[in-house]
Amino acid sequence: FGSLLGICLMTQIITGLLLAMHYTADTTLAFTSVAHMCRNVQFGWLIRNLHANGASFFFICIYLHIGRGLYYGSYLYKETWNIGVILLLTLMATAFVGYVLPWGQMSFWGATVITNLFSAIPYIGQTLVEWAWGGFSVDNPTLTRFFALHFLLHFIIAGLTFIHLTLLHETGSNNPLGISSNCDKIPFHPYFSTKDALGFILLLFPLMTLAMFSPNLLGDPENFTPANPLVTPPHIKPEWYFLFAYAILRSIPNKLGGVLALAASVLILLLIPLLHTSKQRTMTFRPLSQFLFWTLVMNLLILTWIGS
């Protein structure tokens, strides 16, 4: 899945760059500029749909990648794992600020709700939020800085990916038995190149299918309405890939407690390497650990379902 994440990143950067050329980061024009892009720019609709749904595929790949890392004990490469967690956090930040850019209803209210969570931090919270907003509500300054951040964060992700790969290169990759791969080393081309090419096709085919046939399947219909600070949508919810965290946030009646639980749900990944006590690296021959792992997976799926 690592190679698929690489192709996702490249696709997102290319489509995003083309979109940025036609986008206007201004509250009065953002929504219209996106509409103009889809109507009047050559293949603009396709580029936009690929970029929007590409994010979904990016998250599918990264969740599978993390799941596989947990299953096969890859987190014992501590440096690689920790950079990976930082990559996940950066990706989540990027997806969040990117979702605000079309300036629809859900963009605006999603931004309002999530940035507001910073106000739960004692003492400095309120100041922090107003500083992030650039005013007393989500407005033009917020949109312009979110566009700048969205543009910047992709290159940060690309840089971190390079570090991630360099650290992995120090040790070599893991395998399902958790033993040394030295005796199994084979030439990259034609073996791995073919395997990767197949992966790319299996990734890009469903992405193209989704972008062509039902591009709005995963989006929120509220986002077809331009942002209106005076009308709150009946159900404020993020894109599907954040629903598990959002469900955790909403299920705790205390604001600070919810924020901490939300942060912990992702940051717990940093503790995983410290919690490994087995003599075996992978879960291949550990049925009890397997049971717990699949329970975790089901938990995440149920939380995602509840969150919607």
Curated annotation (Swiss-Prot):
Gene Ontology annotations for the cellular component aspect, listed alphabetically: mitochondrial inner membrane
Main location as per UniProt: mitochondrion
Residue intervals passing through the bilayer: 1-21, 45-66, 81-101, 146-166, 194-214, 256-276, 288-308
Organism: Zaratornis stresemanni
BP GO terms, sorted: mitochondrial electron transport, ubiquinol to cytochrome c
Family: Belongs to the cytochrome b family.
Sequence positions that bind heme b b562: 51, 150
Note: Heme 1 (or BL or b562) is low-potential and absorbs at about 562 nm, and heme 2 (or BH or b566) is high-potential and absorbs at about 566 nm.
UniProt GO MF annotations: metal ion binding; ubiquinol-cytochrome-c reductase activity
Compartment annotation: Mitochondrion inner membrane
Disulfide pattern: none
Cofactor needs: heme b
Cofactor: record remark: Binds 2 heme b groups non-covalently.
Subunit relationships: The cytochrome bc1 complex contains 11 subunits: 3 respiratory subunits (MT-CYB, CYC1 and UQCRFS1), 2 core proteins (UQCRC1 and UQCRC2) and 6 low-molecular weight proteins (UQCRH/QCR6, UQCRB/QCR7, UQCRQ/QCR8, UQCR10/QCR9, UQCR11/QCR10 and a cleavage product of UQCRFS1). This cytochrome bc1 complex then forms a dimer.
Binding site for a ubiquinone: 169
Known role: Component of the ubiquinol-cytochrome c reductase complex (complex III or cytochrome b-c1 complex) that is part of the mitochondrial respiratory chain. The b-c1 complex mediates electron transfer from ubiquinol to cytochrome c. Contributes to the generation of a proton gradient across the mitochondrial membrane that is then used for ATP synthesis.
Official protein name in the record: Cytochrome b
Membrane topology category: Multi-pass membrane protein
Residues noted as binding heme b b566 in the record, renumbered to the chain: 65, 164
Family matches, as Pfam families: Cytochrom_B_C, Cytochrome_B
UniProt entry keywords in alphabetical sequence: Electron transport, Heme, Iron, Membrane, Metal-binding, Mitochondrion, Mitochondrion inner membrane, Respiratory chain, Transmembrane, Transmembrane helix, Transport, Ubiquinone
